[in-house]
């Protein structure tokens, strides 16, 4: 069997940047940023744009989350001339 075939799984903190919500989980992602968690240990910080704390399906609230300017690009491209 090949050695070092699978990526290393680490405990990381995921932070939803749209609603400032953080949770601890496991992932194979790596990050140079770290954050001190509630247990006093430091974990790598992975920033995500959307999570269950901010997604309309889970929150029951509809809101526009145009973090990359997609609506403006669409209007510029296909808007009335």
Swiss-Prot record:
Superkingdom in the source lineage: Bacteria
Keyword Ribosomal protein: yes
Protein family per UniProt: Belongs to the bacterial ribosomal protein bL31 family. Type B subfamily.
Record carries keyword Lipoprotein: no
GO biological process, one term: translation
PANTHER family (alphabetical): 50S RIBOSOMAL PROTEIN L31, CHLOROPLASTIC, LARGE RIBOSOMAL SUBUNIT PROTEIN BL31A
Protein name (record): Large ribosomal subunit protein bL31B
Gene that encodes the chain: rpmE2
Coiled-coil segments on the chain, per record: none
């Amino acid at each position: 069997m090949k050695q070092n075939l699978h990526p290393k799984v680490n405990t990381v903190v995921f932070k939803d940047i749209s609603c400032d919500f953080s949770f601890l989980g496991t992932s194979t992602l790596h990050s140079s940023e770290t954050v001190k968690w509630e247990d006093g240990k430091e974990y790598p910080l992975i920033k995500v744009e959307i999570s269950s704390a901010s997604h309309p399906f889970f929150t029951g609230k509809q809101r526009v989350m145009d973090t990359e300017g997609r609506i403006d690009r669409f209007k510029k491209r296909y808007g009335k001339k």
